[in-house]
């Protein structure tokens, strides 16, 4: 099995569901990995999230997950702007990421046919393993 020294978790700050971030943090702890929690603000989406700075992302994570998950865990917070899939893949290359983790919401076929999905775009763009975590 691969040693996952650097894991990237692509966070969606608009999502209230915390299943995938908890899973990502537990996974990083299990492998004693550094986890990079990365938010990408896509200007094409026409919305700028108010917490698109590293310190604000860190605060949001600390307010969302149990404190025990962050203890003794090497966490890097990062923010970027651009196409979500391209920025996640660029970050992964720049920081020698071994595994990308993304949350996934199940959508209807109609929704899937009409709208792009960030997680699917990341999977299609990345040239390294991507672990998809279903959101409840």
Show which residues each predicted segment covers.
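General small-molecule cofactor/ligand-binding pocket signal
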Residues: 38, 76-80, 131
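Gly/Ser-rich helix-loop-strand patches that form or flank binding pockets
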Residues: 93-136
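Small/aliphatic-rich secondary-structure junction motif
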Residues: 2-51
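Structural beta-alpha unit
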Residues: 2, 69-100, 106, 120
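Short, hinge-like loop/turn segments at secondary-structure boundaries
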Residues: 52-56, 118-120
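Short glycine/serine/threonine/alanine-rich loop segments
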Residues: 33-34, 73, 97, 128
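Conserved hydrophobic residues forming the short capping helix/wall of the S-adenosyl-L-methionine
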Residues: 28, 61-69, 92
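Short, solvent-exposed loop/turn segments at secondary-structure boundaries
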Residues: 48-52, 112-115
């Amino acid at each position: 099995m691969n040693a996952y020294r650097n894991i990237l978790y692509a966070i969606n700050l608009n999502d209230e569901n915390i299943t995938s971030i908890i899973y990502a943090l537990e996974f990083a702890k299990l492998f004693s990995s550094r986890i990079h929690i990365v938010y990408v603000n896509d200007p094409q989406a026409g919305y700028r999230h108010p917490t698109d700075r590293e310190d604000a992302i860190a605060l949001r994570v600390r307010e969302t997950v149990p404190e025990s998950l962050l203890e003794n865990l090497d966490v890097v917070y990062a923010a970027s702007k651009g196409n979500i899939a391209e920025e996640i893949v660029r970050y992964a290359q720049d920081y020698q990421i071994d595994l990308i983790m993304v949350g996934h919401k199940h959508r209807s076929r109609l929704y899937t046919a009409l709208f792009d999905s960030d997680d699917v775009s990341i999977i299609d763009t990345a040239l390294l393993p991507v672990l998809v975590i279903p959101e409840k």
